[in-house]
């Protein structure tokens, strides 16, 4: 009774936000959650919805041209859709937002406002064995519970034990905190939870937001380079980096910060391109350069030239 399902392409500015003729607020002001089904089809009926949705997803407020003025609402937005190819194939050729319509699948301003990407390919598909002939869970009761929980917030729960890494920006920290808060409300409705609970939810929340950011990096390039999301344990000062599982197979370069003295570069012979990993270590001795790991005379000569250049220009 507190959520609404919108079929693909049926959302209009009047039905979702506000009707300028009557001044009546739309679905975002009437429901707790709005789910756009088959969102990989045409998502909205008219173009005006996209900028309105951007404002709403950013601040919870919106304003249509006309007499309605600025209005606020609290409905959550859910985009439900399918990826019709293996995830590995999609990630090799494009990005996970590519199934969206052309109006939004490369609109980084819109996509950056998505706080959470749930990997549907990891979720078990229903089978007859998942259903029972006995008493089931009452969805009416569950919806009332969810509605009642909206008045509580645990967005500051992580601050007791953890801090977020420096690569999480404002648009990253907000959804991460909200996800942790939501999981606490679902799994600890009495408000009692431990550090271990929060850490588990924090890892999951960071992964879901990082999945969004990784796609933005594929679309928008260097603007979204900072995807090494992490959190720091306040007690031990240990920093933990949270990866995105499906990205491991597509990244030749590890997705955690490189250790000092390590870097990657690329070289080409005119026809082919090779990725090179360079590791520099210092050892006790007389300061002589020792090159290992390659038999290429050209590469060794390039390394010696670089080494000699650095020595000649180093500041003492």
Task: Please report, for each region that a protein language model flagged, where it lies by residue.
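Conserved nucleotide-binding/hydrolysis micro-motifs of P-loop NTPases
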Residues: 40-42, 77-87, 97, 121-125, ...
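Conserved Walker
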Residues: 17-24, 58-75, 98-107
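A short helix-turn-beta junction within AAA+ P-loop NTPase domains corresponding to the substrate/partner-engaging
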Residues: 91-125
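AAA+/P-loop NTPase substrate/partner-engagement loops
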Residues: 2-46
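Conserved AAA+/SF3 P-loop NTPase catalytic/coupling segment centered on the Walker-B
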Residues: 30-57, 75, 82-93, 109-110
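Helical mechanochemical/support elements of P-loop NTPase systems and associated helical scaffolds
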Residues: 27, 45, 49, 106-110, ...
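Conserved AAA+ ATPase small/helical "lid" subdomain
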Residues: 115-205
């Amino acid at each position: 009774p507190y959520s609404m399902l919108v079929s693909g392409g049926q959302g209009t500015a009047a039905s979702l936000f506000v009707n300028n003729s009557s001044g009546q607020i739309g679905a975002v002001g009437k429901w707790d959650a709005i789910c756009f089904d088959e969102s990989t089809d045409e998502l909205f009926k008219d173009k005006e919805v996209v900028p309105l949705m951007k404002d709403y997803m950013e601040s919870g407020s919106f304003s249509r041209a006309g007499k309605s003025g600025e209005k606020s609402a609290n409905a959550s937005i859910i985009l439900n859709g399918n990826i019709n190819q293996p995830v590995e194939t999609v990630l090799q050729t494009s990005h996970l937002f590519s199934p969206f319509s052309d109006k939004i699948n490369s609109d980084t301003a819109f996509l950056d406002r998505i706080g959470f990407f749930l990997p549907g390919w990891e979720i078990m598909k229903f089978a007859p064995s998942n259903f029972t002939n006995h008493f089931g869970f009452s969805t009416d009761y569950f919806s009332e519970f969810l509605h009642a929980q909206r008045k509580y917030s645990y967005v500051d729960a992580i601050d007791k034990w953890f801090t977020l890494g420096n690569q999480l920006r404002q648009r990253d920290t907000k959804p991460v905190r909200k996800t942790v808060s939501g999981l606490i409300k679902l799994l600890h409705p009495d408000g009692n939870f431990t550090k271990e609970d929060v850490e588990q939810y924090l890892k999951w929340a960071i992964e879901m937001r990082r999945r969004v950011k990784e796609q933005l990096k594929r679309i928008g390039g260097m603007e979204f380079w900072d995807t090494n999301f992490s959190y720091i344990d306040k007690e031990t000062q240990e920093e933990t980096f949270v990866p995105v599982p499906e990205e491991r197979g597509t990244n030749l370069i590890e997705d955690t910060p490189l250790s000092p003295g390590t870097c990657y570069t690329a070289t080409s012979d005119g026809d082919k391109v090779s990725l090179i990993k360079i590791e520099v270590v210092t050892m006790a001795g007389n300061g002589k350069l020792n090159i290992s790991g390659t038999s290429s005379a050209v590469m060794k000569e390039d390394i010696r030239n670089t080494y000699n250049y650095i020595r000649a220009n180093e500041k003492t």
